[in-house]
Swiss-Prot record:
The protein, known as: tRNA pseudouridine synthase B
NCBIfam families (UniProt xref): TruB
Record-listed E.C. numbers: 5.4.99.25
Function: Responsible for synthesis of pseudouridine from uracil-55 in the psi GC loop of transfer RNAs.
Length: 305
């Protein structure tokens, strides 16, 4: 039985659910879950939690992500990416815009920004996913969402061809960001219809694409009984949370029994969440949170026995 976080390289053409389904067959276990959907036409790293590590998938999902994307100016599509039907078109003449204009616009999108999710997305409105409305030709009012763009930078020259302009960007962002929507919004600021024509996720939850492995490689490693070294311990998925290392056996027992604690008992500033680590084994024992009614107390959220 495997336990840990496996950075899978998702190839284009597969859904995130496909990856989980195939892994369950390869590893012969149902206790597998991914940490953030990647669209079928997007490739890149998809951290997958296996066994007890499924309990920390939310924390991996909440960590930042990085993407390499290609933006195409001159055409917008129904899906905001290269798979949709063209709905608006304006020829971009050679050298109609320059890198200074592009860089200035990109800078405007750093920080907390507002996005309207695309109709072809899994965001729910009135209990239904937006793509369900879109497939029926229906349009509904979509919620404006705030997302965080840590950084965005152009990584290529501008390429003009066939009335379009292409350029690459690298984006570091928070959970819930739609790069497709970012591409179309950048185009609007530059005065052109636009879409995202290529996307690769290069980092997710601290897992880099260079450390990811394909489903074929996973299958081979599993058959050779050499897959375990490629799994990261579940503690890795909690690295963004503050930690308290515990050596006192009595306190360890209380933690593993899910008891509450007075915050003054620990010589450390405690925010909303923290992780208790066994100082001897360096294994996580529990995740504790601020008590909702008693400011001086913390209570268990998840205990790992």
């Amino acid at each position: 039985m495997y336990n840990g976080i496996l950075p899978v390289y998702k190839e284009r053409g597969l859904t995130s659910h496909d990856v989980v389904f195939k892994l369950r067959k390869i590893l012969k276990t149902k206790k597998i879950g991914h940490t953030g959907t990647l669209d079928p036409e997007v490739s890149g790293v998809l951290p997958v939690c296996i066994g007890t590590a499924t309990r920390v998938s939310d924390y991996v999902m909440d960590m930042g992500k990085s993407y390499n994307a290609t933006i195409t100016l001159g055409e917008s599509t129904t899906t905001e990416d290269q798979t949709g039907e063209v709905i608006d078109k304006i020829d971009v003449q050679a050298n109609a815009i320059n890198i200074n204009e592009v860089d200035a616009v990109l800078k405007q999108f750093e920080g907390i920004i507002e996005q309207v999710p695309p109709m072809y997305s899994s965001v729910k409105v009135n209990g239904k996913k937006l793509y369900e409305y879109a497939r029926k030709g229906e349009t509904v009012e979509r919620p404006i969402r705030k997302v965080n763009i840590d950084s965005i930078a152009r990584t290529s020259e501008l390429q003009f061809e066939d009335g379009k302009c292409h350029f690459n960007i690298e984006v570091k962002c928070g959970k819930g960001t739609y790069i497709r929507t970012l591409a179309t919004d950048i185009g609007k600021q530059l005065g052109y219809p636009a879409h995202m024509s290529l996307l690769t996720r290069i980092n997710s939850g601290g897992f880099d694409i260079k450390d990811s492995i394909t489903l074929d490689q996973i299958s081979q490693l599993h058959e050779q009984d050499t897959l375990q070294p490629h799994l990261f311990p579940l503690e890795y998925g909690l690295k963004s949370l503050p930690k308290i290392y515990v050596s006192d056996e009595n306190i360890k027992t209380r933690i593993l029994n899910g008891q509450k604690f007075n915050k003054k008992q620990f010589n450390q500033t405690i925010e909303q969440q923290l992780v208790f680590i066994d100082s001897e084994t360096e294994k996580v024992m529990a995740i504790y949170i601020q008590h909702p009614e008693k400011n001086h107390e913390i209570k268990p959220k998840k205990v790992f026995n």
